């Protein structure tokens, strides 16, 4: 009998830290399901979610201000373990009667923490003995007075209260960040909290997830037929195989060539599915429809929503040609939901609408099926490995549903698409040739509709600009710009400017996420 993968779960309340998604990844790596929600989530949701424990993330607020963020008071009435990290520790202290103030010495970066006084959270965990831990600190506020019933469990030379605990209530606070890799024993500490203190069983495994997803798809779809919007990427391809296992011939895949794909991508996708997967795939050439819909539109959010609406119109047109199509399946993943919905908060601003989340029309005639919307990208890839997806497909960099439309700043024109395709092809080809493709997690070119002065021979030129973007990331929620070799960038830049007549300048994007997003629009 399959274990219930959602029976034991952790709720992570997000106070805005750049590391919050890492907490979720670490908890899931332990084998326990968790969800992210904004700190102001309503009490009814928390009760219904019924977590085995709560983690309060760090955040940028100054906890001593009267209007700073606070944890929902209900979590202290649920009789479940709570772990506060950095800001989460500080607000827990204040809300339970303690006191925090500006630190005498701010701590940013590596620090050594000494654990003291027995606690189930830190007991026996150290780096080389003497109860010392190498950790990552990032704070200018510190707890100065413990709430009643709490005791000190960790300190540094600069921060006397670097950890506290109310062992009877299973409340814990850490001023350092156990979720980041710089804290060497961080995963061990989180596992101690999740597995031992919260007593969560490790049911969140790839095999269990696959079994649950296939079962749920069978129950949801029944004897009806389902249409899948197939992009050729990992996400929709994994959904295709899951649906094939669940409902077999009831599945029809529709690959929409919207004229915004990379060079020869449509043919490559059709060939891959014909050779590796026995699913029915219909190719729809809809370039004219998408270009007309995008005509004169220059706003990123509007472009995403236009793309989403156009896709749905195509899918509904195809559904009418087939029999008994009641469901539309998509490869929506958890980061799409988080960025589009603001982790279920009424206050959080949407970063960007994903075409398959925020871009869907309210008048959708088909019932939506999103089997992997709870999964991070690396979890989807693990499922793909077990399901037998081709290696080249699993290792292929993500490509956004709106395609090149959001890699062209402003209006989308055929001329811009053609230029961008050439530049992107050169960049990716050289990454492969120089054995660099698999050292980065996503790489692409961006077309900038601005012109820059250049020189060709003795002549002045005034043409467009291309930006190259490459990042390293685990879950695509945070990302570090890739330090590609200068000689390589020089090679790519020269090829682009020499081989594409309308490009006079190439730049390299050195923005990390946050504060930037991976895609430019």
UniProtKB/Swiss-Prot annotation:
UniProt KW Nucleus keyword: no
What the entry lists under InterPro entries is as follows: Class_I_gatase-like (IPR029062), GATASE (IPR017926), GMP_synth_C (IPR001674), GMP_synth_GATase (IPR004739), GMP_synthase (IPR022955), GMPS_ATP_PPase_dom (IPR025777), NAD/GMP_synthase (IPR022310), Rossmann-like_a/b/a_fold (IPR014729)
Quaternary organization:
Homodimer.
User: For ATP, which residues are the binding ones?
Assistant: 231-237
Per the Swiss-Prot or TrEMBL record, the active site comprises 86 (nucleophile), 177, 179
Q: Where does this protein come from, organism-wise?
A: Vesicomyosocius okutanii subsp. Calyptogena okutanii (strain HA)
| Associated pathway | Purine metabolism; GMP biosynthesis; GMP from XMP (L-Gln route): step 1/1
- Name of protein: GMP synthase [glutamine-hydrolyzing]
- Under Enzyme Commission nomenclature, its number is 6.3.5.2
Q: Which Pfam families match?
A: GATase, GMP_synt_C, NAD_synthase
